[in-house]
């Protein structure tokens, strides 16, 4: 276990990932607990659910939110393990992964929030009017997405700091961290030949 580094837990970025993991777990757990109380997804299904109204199982958007939050919780645990074992991927790889998860989280939040606010029974009675757990789940999904945005900013800054470039992109000025010229930067930084003299 020589590669294990417990001091990484002091890093703001590591702690932010831990918060994201907690938020995503809370989001899918809250939605899983919403077994009734949802006034929808349509009038016919609502009648079939009975007087206690429907659970999250009747909503494809809510099930999508659960799936995305579970995936992100697992993803964040893997990332934290990589940090602890000093097996952190290059910033461009990490940024790409965060971008994909960011899109999925925002889509899950937006779709669920839309489903939560539509009206089936009457214009003043939205689907989630009495569904406290569903509303909490959607809120925590939003907080997770927002926290991931900050992780993307941290990772982008690291990308620039190490002068990383996209393989095959060439040394163009518009690529973050890469300047024009004949020399190309790499990650991790390589020792110059003069250091061996």
Swiss-Prot record:
Main location: membrane
Intervals, Extracellular compartment: 35-63, 121-135
Subunit structure: Homodimer and heterodimers.
Domain of life: Eukaryota
Pfam family, one: MARVEL
Protein topology in the membrane: Multi-pass membrane protein
Biased composition (Low complexity): 180-197
Listed InterPro entries: Marvel
Species for this entry: Micromonas commoda (strain RCC299 / NOUM17 / CCMP2709) (Picoplanktonic green alga)
Keyword annotations of the record: Cell membrane, Membrane, Transmembrane, Transmembrane helix
UniProt keyword Cell membrane, yes or no: yes
Positions of region (Disordered): 178-197
One GO cellular component term: plasma membrane
Stretches that traverse the bilayer: 14-34, 64-84, 100-120, 136-156
Protein name: CASP-like protein 0U1
Compartments (UniProt record): Cell membrane
Family: Belongs to the Casparian strip membrane proteins (CASP) family.
Lineage summary: Eukaryota, Viridiplantae, Chlorophyta, Mamiellophyceae, Mamiellales
Residue intervals annotated with topology Cytoplasmic: 1-13, 85-99, 157-197
């Amino acid at each position: 276990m020589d590669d294990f580094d417990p001091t990484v837990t002091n890093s703001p970025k590591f702690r932010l990932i831990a918060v994201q993991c907690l938020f995503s777990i809370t989001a899918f757990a809250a939605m899983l607990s919403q077994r009734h109380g949802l006034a929808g997804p349509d009038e016919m299904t609502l009648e079939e659910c009975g007087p206690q109204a429907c659970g999250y199982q009747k909503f494809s958007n809510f099930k999508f939110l659960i799936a995305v939050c579970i995936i992100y919780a697992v993803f964040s645990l893997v990332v934290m393990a990589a940090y602890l074992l000093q097996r952190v991927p290059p910033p461009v790889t990490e940024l790409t992964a965060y971008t994909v998860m960011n899109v999925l989280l925002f889509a899950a939040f937006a779709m669920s929030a839309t489903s939560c606010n539509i009206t089936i029974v009457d214009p003043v009675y939205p689907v989630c009017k009495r569904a406290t757990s569903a509303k909490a789940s959607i809120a925590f999904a939003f907080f997770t997405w927002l926290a991931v945005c900050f992780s993307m900013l941290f990772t982008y800054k690291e990308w620039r700091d190490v002068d990383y470039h996209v393989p095959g992109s060439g040394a163009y000025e518009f690529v973050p961290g890469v300047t024009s010229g004949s020399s190309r930067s790499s990650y991790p930084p390589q020792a110059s030949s003069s250091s061996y003299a």
